[in-house]
Structure formats: structure tokens, C-alpha cells
A protein has these predicted regions:
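Short, surface-exposed amphipathic charged segments that create phosphate/polyanion-binding patches used
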Residues: 24-25, 93-97, 146-155
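Conserved nucleotide-binding/hydrolysis micro-motifs of P-loop NTPases
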Residues: 14-16, 60, 84-90, 138-141
Length: 187
């Protein structure tokens, strides 16, 4: 979806893979840190030069949410497409499967911290966002189908107005605090 947009797109996981491929012997931790710093620089440049940039982040730390809030305070339109899972255990299982398929791992403590902090950071960003779409990606796809699951839209807010989905009663438990904050903020 983002690759088809007019914005530049940055995925730190893909950047880390390219770094490792170009630098045999580079460890995953160093590649991840380097890719993260590259993404931070790209975001700072996009803010300073008012460029369009789409990028992936967990929102689990403090730097990216701070930069996004800073961008919004400068009048830059900030849109977030947030994709969540039902629990940290679901994330841990997905990472385990990724590792089994040859991908990189993430320490369990980091997954749990990011799961908690990303939702808190999203709630804190709600007042300044031009648009937010929240998706539940908790459903696993049928391996026989060999395709990714289709995330379910949980909340869509545009310029302070909740525009969807029509039935907020089916909001999954993990997203209820976020939806409640949006309702309190935007009515």
C-alpha cells in the first residue's frame, strides 16, 4: 500500500537485511541499530524539508513518537496506520515463526515493552494526528492459502472525526483503550 504511494518508503528491517548482505560478518544487532539511525535521519530530513515519507516503526520507543509530535506541531500532516496484535504473546509467536523461516529475532522483553509502549504512545499522539487508521492483525492466515491475513479496520479518524468503522462494538480487547481515548477526544 505504501510502496504505491507518492511518498518515499523506508522499512528498517529491509534496510538491515541490505546492510547484512552488503557487509558479510555484520551482526544483526549492529545492522538493526544502523538501519534505525538511517530511518531517524530520513524522518528528521523529511520534517526539516517538508517531504513526504512513509516508514515503519513500532512506536515502542520515545524518539519516533517525539519526532512525529514535533512534525505535527510544525503544521505537517501526520498520518499513522497502526497494525496491532491481540497480545505480546501473539507477537512473540510471529517472531518465532519469522526466525524459523530464517528471519531475525527480537528479545522477548523488547517485544513485551514495545507492545505496551506503542499503544501508550499512539494514545498520546491521537490529538495531533491528521489521520489514524488502526488495524487488528491478530488473525493468522491459513498456511494452505499461502497468503497473509487481511487486517481488520478497528478505528479510522480523519481530522478529528471518527469516520469508521460503523460498528465500534466489535473492537478487540487490545484496542479498546485506544478507541476509548479517540472517542473521548473526538466524540
Amino acid at each position: 500500500m505504501f510502496r504505491a504511494s507518492d511518498a518515499d518508503y523506508y522499512n528498517p528491517d529491509e534496510a538491515a537485511r541490505r546492510l547484512i548482505a552488503a557487509n558479510p560478518g555484520l551482526d544483526q544487532t549492529t545492522a538493526n541499530a544502523t538501519a534505525w539511525r538511517q530511518g531517524k535521519r530520513l524522518l528528521e530530513r523529511a520534517i526539516n524539508e517538508r517531504l513526504d515519507l512513509a516508514f515503519e516503526t513500532t512506536l515502542g520507543g520515545s524518539t519516533m513518537p517525539r519526532l512525529l509530535a514535533e512534525a505535527a506541531s510544525q503544521g505537517i500532516e501526520v498520518r499513522i496506520w497502526y497494525v496491532g496484535l491481540a497480545s505480546p504473546e501473539a507477537h512473540i509467536e510471529r517472531v518465532r515463526r519469522r526466525v524459523d523461516a530464517g528471519g531475525h529475532g527480537i528479545p522477548e522483553a523488547d517485544i513485551r515493552r514495545r507492545w505496551r509502549h506503542s499503544r501508550l504512545n499512539l494514545v498520546q499522539l491521537l490529538p495531533v494526528l491528521t489521520e489514524v487508521r488502526i488495524y487488528d492483525n491478530s488473525q493468522d492466515a491459513d498456511p494452505a492459502e499461502a497468503k497473509a491475513p487481511r487486517p481488520m479496520l478497528v478505528l479510522h479518524v480523519v481530522r478529528g472525526k471518527i469516520v469508521g468503522p460503523p460498528d465500534l462494538l466489535s473492537t478487540p480487547g487490545w484496542a479498546k483503550p485506544i478507541v476509548a481515548a479517540a472517542i473521548e477526544l473526538h466524540g
